[in-house]
Amino acid sequence: YSYADAITNYLHLKEKNKFLSEENAKLLSLTQRQDHTKFESKNISNDFIYKSAKVINNSINKRNNYLTINKGISHGVKEGMGVITNKGVIGIVQSSSKNYSIVISLLNNKTSIGIKLKKNNHFGILKWNGYNYKEASINNFPSHIDISLGDTIVTSSYSMIFPENVIIGTVKEINTDEGYYNILIHLFEDFNQLNYTYIVESKNIIEKKILEKSIRNE
C-alpha cells in the first residue's frame, strides 16, 4: 500500500463525499415534497429547497464567527438563506459573490434562532453564549413550562429561514432567575468539524415579508 495509493484513495473519498452531499440535497427536497403531500395540514417543509455546499473556511474561537461556503450567486444563493447540516442549524448567509458566500455562524452574537421544545412545542430564542462552540443558551424561558435535562431543542415554525423541526441540541443545564429559566444547550453539531452543509431556500419568504409588512404599517 503505497503513498500514491493513499493519495488516490483520499481524493476518491472526497469526490464520493461531495457526490453524496449533492444527492442528499436532492433527496431532502424530494422528501419534503412527498411529506407535504402526505401530511399537508401539519407540514410546511414543501416551502423549502436544498442545495449542498462545502465549508472552505470557518472560525469558532472569536466573539463573532463566520464561515465561507463554495456556493454563490451563480448557484442561486442569496442573502438571508439558512444553512444547516443533518445535525443542526449552522447559520445564515450574509453576502455572496459569484461562486462563494459568507455565512454568519450560529456562533455569533448577531445570530438569534427561533426554537421550541420538541416535546411540547413551547417557543424560545436561542443564542450563542460566546464561550464554548459546543454550547448555546436560551434565556428568559418561562419557569412554568415543563422542561428537563436531556430534552431536545428544534427550530420553530416562526421563522421562514429554516424549516420547522430541524434538530439543534439537548438541554444540558437549567438555572432559575426570578421566575424564568436560563437554559444551557449542548449543540448536536460540532462546529470544529464542519464539512458539507445544506443551503435552505424558502420559496415563500418574500410573500410572507410583504404580508407582515402590511400589518406593521397599519
Region annotations inferred by a language model:
Residues Y1-S74, K78-E218:
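Extracytoplasmic/periplasmic terminal helices and flexible tails
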